């Protein structure tokens, strides 16, 4: 029952947000999605139309956070496009906003491996997300067109734990990245 800030990237109609709202009674929940299909309203739920592929929209969202003195999130959930490049770009843009002890969660990060028709935008010269998570855990630098060595070293310094879990559905893989 403590006050926490949650950010969900990719809210769709807001079903997850509704469960967060009822479970975390004092949470302020921020939702960003490029489509407005959101079906819930509350003074504790803030929806922003934001396509995280468009830097100007991310910039506007960050300005809103700064203007309202929202400096951190206890939890950030990336349930957005599930595409490789979007996942890594979101991680680089938002992970620093996690409070100490908080979690950055990535849902369904193996979609392109399981659904052959799903967009696989993994560059041929890049390692996949599973390998990135292993390297982050081992604190070993890796080649990436998105996560530069400066950001990787930041992660090595602040990540305390990385846990991957298999969900009930075939494509459901989720990772919890905890910040020290």
Over which residues does each language-model region extend?
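S-adenosylmethionine/decaboxylated-SAM
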Residues: 1-180
């Amino acid at each position: 029952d403590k006050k926490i800030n949650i950010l969900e990237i990719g809210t769709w109609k807001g079903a997850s947000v509704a469960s967060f709202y009822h479970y975390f009674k004092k949470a302020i929940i921020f939702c960003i999605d490029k489509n407005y299909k959101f079906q819930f309203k509350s003074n504790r739920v803030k929806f922003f139309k934001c396509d995280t592929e468009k830097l100007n929209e991310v910039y506007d969202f960050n300005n809103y956070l700064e203007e309202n003195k929202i400096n951190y999130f206890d939890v950030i959930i990336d349930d957005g496009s599930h595409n490789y490049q979007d996942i890594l770009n979101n991680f680089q843009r938002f992970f620093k906003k996690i409070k100490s002890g908080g979690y950055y969660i990535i849902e369904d990060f193996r979609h392109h491996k399981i659904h052959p028709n799903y967009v696989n935008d993994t560059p041929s010269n890049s390692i996949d997300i599973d390998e990135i998570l292993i390297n982050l855990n081992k604190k070993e630098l890796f080649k990436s067109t998105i996560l530069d060595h400066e950001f990787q070293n930041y992660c090595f310094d602040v990540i305390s734990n990385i846990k991957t879990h298999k969900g009930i559905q075939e494509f459901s893989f989720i990772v919890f990245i905890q910040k020290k």
